[in-house]
Curated annotation (Swiss-Prot):
A Pfam family that the UniProt record links to this protein: Cytochrom_B_C
Transmembrane regions: 33-53, 77-98, 113-133, 178-198, 226-246, 288-308, 320-340, 347-367
Membrane topology term: Multi-pass membrane protein
Function as written in the Swiss-Prot or TrEMBL entry: Component of the ubiquinol-cytochrome c reductase complex (complex III or cytochrome b-c1 complex) that is part of the mitochondrial respiratory chain. The b-c1 complex mediates electron transfer from ubiquinol to cytochrome c. Contributes to the generation of a proton gradient across the mitochondrial membrane that is then used for ATP synthesis.
Quaternary state and interactors: The cytochrome bc1 complex contains 11 subunits: 3 respiratory subunits (MT-CYB, CYC1 and UQCRFS1), 2 core proteins (UQCRC1 and UQCRC2) and 6 low-molecular weight proteins (UQCRH/QCR6, UQCRB/QCR7, UQCRQ/QCR8, UQCR10/QCR9, UQCR11/QCR10 and a cleavage product of UQCRFS1). This cytochrome bc1 complex then forms a dimer.
UniProt cross-references to PROSITE patterns, sorted A to Z: CYTB_CTER, CYTB_NTER
UniProt cofactor note: Binds 2 heme b groups non-covalently.
Family the UniProt entry places it in: Belongs to the cytochrome b family.
Listed GO biological process terms: mitochondrial electron transport, ubiquinol to cytochrome c
InterPro entries: Cyt_b/b6_C (IPR005798), Cyt_b/b6_C_sf (IPR036150), Cyt_b/b6_N (IPR005797), Cytb/b6-like_sf (IPR027387), Cytochrome_b (IPR030689), Cytochrome_b_C_euk/bac (IPR048260), Cytochrome_b_N_euk/bac (IPR048259), Di-haem_cyt_TM (IPR016174)
Other observations noted: Heme 1 (or BL or b562) is low-potential and absorbs at about 562 nm, and heme 2 (or BH or b566) is high-potential and absorbs at about 566 nm.
Protein name, UniProt field: Cytochrome b
Cofactor(s) the protein requires to work: heme b
Length: 379
């Protein structure tokens, strides 16, 4: 008797992806974040869908509709805070997932890696537009500042900004289109995730040693399904602790004040997960230069496969590169801190040094260290 799981046209796709998939026997907890990102995406889509049922994308009623969700809708407060803090969990998992790829050399699967970078851009765009929707002070001024950056593009900049705004300032038209894009982008992201997985399953997973693991594979189910469920339960635990005990921990108090175009908040800053890029943007005193640095701070990830000069794939057996990698992590934490500080001495100079170090480590120091390590091993 033939097994439906292996013969049914639709079920066999699921089978080859999540059940009978040959997986390396030694992948660590760092490989859990892919499935956790999938879980985050599902949580965000469902909570977002229920929020959209009660939200109105009009400048006059947007702020009130969010208040209405929190006060009058059954468990509306829970859905709203799960969605807001779910975004934070999403980005924590994203950063750890990308960091894992950098550390273990997963970027050598360059189709998978490049689609991952595009996914990162898309999730960042989605999160930015979502932050505008509650129409608080930080929503309005964040949208104004970030969209205004496009005016730095020569010739077409001003026209482009006014086209995105749908007028001469951030207003009703901007809010409506941001809501539309915020709704559609997660579904496009989901489609891209499938392409990401398609390319990953062409090559199979990498593993901590960076060596080919074809000779030692185990089925995904039950080994990694159980492992992923454990990760998922821990993620939900952390998310719910955040939501139920301190839902506003990662938010900005300014966003509890309705948007007012006539009063600028003293410190305009984005959500915590954009602060590292915001710090890089602010560290360059030229508008166009800042915008380019901002874009390249993420786009630089696409260069990783080209900058890999080591004869080994993973950093597991490369102590010098490991050391530099953790300095890079510390640098990104420093940038995140600086992004939330006012533009004054000594924060300006710290931000500039941290930005220079960020690009120097990736473009210059890590490749150089890789060559030194090759020489030390007489390769």
């Amino acid at each position: 008797m033939t097994n439906t799981r292996k013969t049914h046209p639709l079920i066999k796709i699921i089978n080859h992806s999540f059940i009978d998939l040959p997986a390396p026997s030694n992948i660590s907890t760092w490989w859990n974040f892919g499935s956790l990102l999938g879980l985050c995406l599902v949580i965000q889509i469902f909570t977002g869908l229920f929020l959209a049922m009660h939200y109105t994308s009009d400048t006059m009623t947007a702020f009130s509709s969010v208040t209405h969700i929190c006060r009058d809708v059954n468990y509306g407060w829970l859905i709203r805070y799960m969605h807001a803090n779910g975004a934070s969990m999403f980005f924590i998992c994203l950063f750890l997932h990308v960091g894992r790829g950098m550390y273990y050399g997963s970027y050598t699967y360059f189709e998978t890696w490049n689609i991952g970078v595009i996914l990162l851009f898309m999730v960042m765009a989605t999160a930015f537009m979502g932050y505008v929707l509650p129409w608080g002070q930080m929503s309005f001024w964040g949208a104004t500042v970030i969209t205004n950056l496009l005016s730095a593009i020569p010739y077409i900049g001003t026209t482009l900004v006014e086209w995105i705004w749908g007028g001469f300032s951030v207003d009703k038209a901007t809010l409506t289109r941001f809501f539309a894009f915020h709704f559609i982008l997660p579904f496009i992201t989901t489609a891209l995730v499938m392409v990401h997985l398609l390319f990953l399953h062409e090559t199979g997973s990498n593993n901590p040693s960076g060596l080919i693991s074809d000779s030692d594979k185990i089925p995904f189910h039950p080994y990694y399904t159980i492992k992923d469920i454990l990760g998922a339960l821990l993620l939900i635990l952390i998310l719910m602790i955040l939501v139920l005990f301190s839902p506003d921990l990662l938010g900005d108090p300014d966003n509890y004040t309705p948007a007012n175009p006539l009063s600028t908040p003293p410190h305009i800053k984005p959500e915590w997960y954009f602060l590292f890029a915001y710090a890089i943007l602010r560290s360059i005193p030229n508008k166009l230069g800042g915008v380019l640095a901002l874009v390249f701070s993420i786009l630089i990830l696409m260069l990783f496969p080209l900058l890999h000069l080591s004869k080994q794939r993973s950093m597991m057996f490369r102590p010098l590169s490991q050391c530099m990698f953790w300095i890079l992590v510390a640098d990104l934490i420093t940038l995140t801190w600086i992004g939330g500080q006012p533009v004054e001495y000594p924060y300006i100079i710290i931000g500039q040094l941290a930005s220079i170090l960020y690009f120097a480590i990736i473009l210059l120091i890590l490749p150089t260290i890789s060559l030194i390590e090759n020489k030390l091993l007489k390769w």
